[in-house]
């Protein structure tokens, strides 16, 4: 992938911008990966939990802080971490916040992946590997992954994509399988020199395309147990996700000045709006920037005639002047 060749140049040339992108990505990743699984926290608690030192107040906040801890563990690795069952269990324990009774433990009962039909009925979409066979199957998955990497006959991105897909089909934990799969994605990409997950939230991109994500997952899991499933649609989705991430990475790095990076990101986000927006809309898109900074940038842009404000209080909204 051509963009990977540029990432080292970007890292050397614009460290201040990357610091902001890194902070923004970890906030978005923790929020999106948990929200995909139905775990949400109040907007005003997001930044203190992920970037600050705020103590979790409930189970949802524990899981958000846990995901942050898992990402911190991944990105602090100085050398590639050989994938193994204990690594996956560690990621699960971290992502679950550490206080869940089965954090870091394989499932003890068989599970099913269920979808809700438009009429409200529940339908079994997929039956994962049994609890009894899970430890052996995960061990085999990790061993096959390492062997494929050593053989170098298949491009590493396809090896990573296949590993993540098989992990989702095994569904080795009672809960949190999706989050572990996304953490494993970042860990394995990093081991092959693809650093984009540090700066652009892959979890956010998955959330933004989750209908396609689940459609492809369902399609490609058919006949998985017999080893006769079609994997190419999943590869296409996965590679498209990475391409989008690197394209966004390039746009972010090349379109903002080195200082002050946060203000530039806010300004760039505002100018990209095509409809009305509120201060909280911008703050959600640029979580690395404080609400005070967003207010300051909007005030500056209003003064220079780039945006206008309508209404007051909670009903106030902004609009870009074209």
Q: What annotation goes with each model-predicted range?
A:
Residues 1-322:
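FIC/Doc superfamily catalytic core
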